[in-house]
Amino acid sequence: MMSWADKYRPKNIDDVILNSEIRKQITEWIESWKEGIPKKRSLILYGSQGTGKTTTAYAIAGTFGVPVVEMNASDQRNRDSMRGTALMASLYGDLFVESAKRPSKVILIDEADNMFERGGDTGGIYELSKIIKNSANPIVITMNDIFEFRKKNYASDVISASLTIEMKQYGRKLDKNYNEFRRNIKARLIFILKNEGYTLPDQVVDRIIDRNMPDIRSMINDLEASAVSGTNISDQSSRDVPEIVYYMVDKAFKRNYDDTLRSIYGSDIDDSYYVSWIDENLPLKTVDLQDLVSAYEVISYADHILWAMERRRHYELMAFPMEIAGGVAYYIENMKHEYVKYQSPSYISQMSKTKEKRHAMMSLALKIGLLIHMGAQRTSEDLWFYSLLYQHNEKLRTFFEEKLNLTQGEENVLTRSE
């Protein structure tokens, strides 16, 4: 059972809700590839979250009729691979085949403004500029803050080689673009309702739009929740996440899978958060040990898919972990039917208690990483070693204190103090 947001995701650029000026620029860029390799081989889409940058990139690929090869620039493994043009070529085959008659793929560089935040680490941006210069395939680069990206070395080379479009659908409310954008959104929502066999009052649809503007995916999620459940989601002043997930967990344990799926698709709850809630409350709902073992096997499978999504970037698996975890009640033969007060995942309260310490560890890793020209992730793995040196080598301790401007929390990490 696919969510409405996924079911009605734009397949090509004509399906994307854009103002006329943005649509014209993107369409002209797509058309320029039909005449050979254009001067501007890459397209930069920038703007706040929820404005459809990534959706537009996939719609562009759909218009070309080719797949997307996605690299998330904020991911450390992909940042490192960006440094080597030869490695990119080996990974993506005909990326540099100038003789290609038409594009064979769209290269998506997502969240490029998060690329190489460490000072002086600009090799990847330089390599990206070379890739743009030589690519035989369209490249779409998304970023939230182009002005922050401009400050990085070689960023100007990337920007000058690209067509740059701000994904801002309107300047202010009630201007021409705002009215056009709103009309198009409302028409799309009404079309979805009609296609799914539901109706909602006009004022409810209007409130859903106003509540989520300009995030279309959230609008469709609220539309589905309101239509299917018969409740007016738009009347809620804010999404009370603990209350919503409590309701969703209760649905999962009542063995009505259709209701469970509706609660999942009608929410913005993160997959891992939902799975964690189910996992935490299994002992409260099971009587027999064997039932608990069977239920944990289901959660283990959902957890494995979460790992594949987060570590291997298999985002096509999104929603599967929730769908799997949501069916766990069918593996519990003897379930407690009396009232149970569901518990928030224990790791969340533990994370809250250790928040300051974790923040100190990360800031210390960043400082040491800058000093020794190493990534924060790798440095954080070696903090135990720097802690030993700090405690037993007076010269290094003095050096760290002079160079790192340590906070009390960072010093506590190095001295292993609580």
Swiss-Prot record:
Write down the InterPro entries for this protein, in alphabetical order.
Answer: AAA+_ATPase (IPR003593), ATPase_AAA_core (IPR003959), P-loop_NTPase (IPR027417), Rep_factor-C_lsu (IPR023935), RFC_lid (IPR047854)
| Key words of the record | ATP-binding, DNA replication, Nucleotide-binding
What CDD domains would the database entry show?
A: AAA, HLD_clamp_RFC
Reading the lineage from the top rank, the first entry is Archaea
GO terms assigned for molecular function: ATP binding; ATP hydrolysis activity; DNA clamp loader activity
Q: Name one GO biological process term.
A: DNA replication
**Binding residues for ATP, per the UniProt record?**
G47, S48, Q49, G50, T51, G52, K53, T54
* SMART domains membership: AAA
Q: Give a yes or no for keyword Ribosomal protein in this entry.
A: no
Tell me the protein family, please.
Belongs to the activator 1 small subunits family. RfcL subfamily.
Report the function annotation for this chain.
Answer: Part of the RFC clamp loader complex which loads the PCNA sliding clamp onto DNA.
NCBIfam families to which the protein is assigned, alphabetical = PRK04195.1-5
UniProt subunit comment = Heteromultimer composed of small subunits (RfcS) and large subunits (RfcL).
What is the name of the protein in this document? Replication factor C large subunit
Species assigned in the record: Thermoplasma acidophilum (strain ATCC 25905 / DSM 1728 / JCM 9062 / NBRC 15155 / AMRC-C165)
